[in-house]
Amino acid sequence: PSRFWLINRKTAEIEYNVIPAGDVRLRVAQTGQLDVPDTYLACQYENVATVLIDGTEVTLSQNPGRNAMASWTRNGFDYLLLCEEPQMNLLGGVIQDFVTQTTASTVSGQQVTQE
């Protein structure tokens, strides 16, 4: 990971540098609380497909050469992988690793404070 932060105290975001295409961002939040960027929500995707990866239903939304995202839900958490201007089907090339190797959990007794 190259950077990470918390958005609106509910959504964690981790930025990864994927060579050669640049950055992808992974967002995770408890189910129903995921903050999706407006630029991705407002987009009309040319290609939308649902695929099964390791028993998890994943929705891929892509526009060739423009924004792409993959979303899935597992064990009480929503996941969203975001790519801006992906090259050579970057999303399709990395999505299996993100779906199969990413897990999230809550931390009991911890309180997030703002400084």
Regions found by a protein language model. Give the residues of each.
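Short, solvent-exposed recognition patches
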Residues: 1-78
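Surface-exposed amphipathic alpha-helical segments
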Residues: 75-115
